[in-house]
C-alpha cells in the first residue's frame, strides 16, 4: 500500500506545482518566417519585429479579461494587443552625421560613403535565437538581438533584454535599479565612417566642401499614451508608491550626476534614459547638454534623439522601460488575483480530500 500512496503524493505535488508554474509565466512565441519574437514574463510582453526593427511592449496577464483594450472586442483566447493605447513602441528612425555646430553633413559627389540613413525602418534586420533562460549582469533575463547592415557599411545592433527579477545594473557611471518585467534595449552603432575633410570628403549643410563630422544623431520614433511625457525624479515617483531608481553608492548626497533621466510615458509606465554612452564597450562619455532630446511629433508620437560622439569603433546607448499596470486595470487586478487564488485553493482542497480518502 505504501508504494501506491507515495506515487499518489508525488503525482499530487507534481500536478499542483504545475498549476503554480503555469500561473507565474507564460510561454514565448518565435516565428522565424515572419521574423518576430514575443517574450513574456512578470506581466510584461515584448514583441520584437525583424522587419524594420520595431520593439513594442505592454502590460499583459495571460488570464486577464481584456479590459485594457478600448478599441478591440474581447476574444475567447486573448492575445496581446500591441496597438492598444497603453502599449509602448520604439523604432530607430534615422541616423544623421553632424558637424561641431550640430548641422548635417552630407556626402560629396565624389564620395560613395553615406553620412545619413533616413529610413532605418525600411531595413531588414536579422533576428537571433531567443535566449529565454540567461542572465544580464547576474540577473535572470530573456534576450534577443536584431542586426542590420547600414548603407555606409556600419552595423546597427539592438539587444533586447526582458528582466525576470529585481536588481541593480550599471551603465558606465550610472547605477540604477531594474524590476522584474523591465525591458531594455542596447542600441549599438559600429564602424560609422565620419567625414574628416581629407580621406573622406563631405559637404556642409550649405554645400561647402571639406566639412568635418563631429557627432552622430540617432533618432527613435516612440509611441506612448502620454502626449507630452513628463520628466520625473525619485521624489515625485515616491508620491505614487514607487521605489527609487537611482543608486549612487559612492556619494548619496551627490546631485544625481550618476543617475539616469526618467520620463512618465502614461499608463503608469516610464522610460529610463541614460545621460551618457559607452564608447568601445568601456569608456563612458556624457552626451552634450540637451541630449537625449524628447520632442512631440504627433498625438501619441515622439521623436527621441541621442547625440553620439565620434569614434571609429562602437557606441552604445541603453534605454529601458518599466511597464506599469494601466490605471483602469488596477481596481480589477485584485478581483482577478482573488479568482486565481480561489481556484488554486479549491483545487488543492479537492486533491487533499482525495488523498485523505485514499489513506
From Swiss-Prot:
Localisation per UniProt entry: Secreted
GO cellular component, one term: extracellular region
Tissue spec: Component of the acid-insoluble and acid-soluble organic matrix of the aragonitic skeleton (at protein level).
Coiled coil: 66-89
Residue ranges, annotated region (Disordered): 60-83, 224-254
Alphabetical UniProt keywords: Coiled coil, Secreted, Signal
Signal peptide start and end residues: 1-26
Protein name: Acidic skeletal organic matrix protein
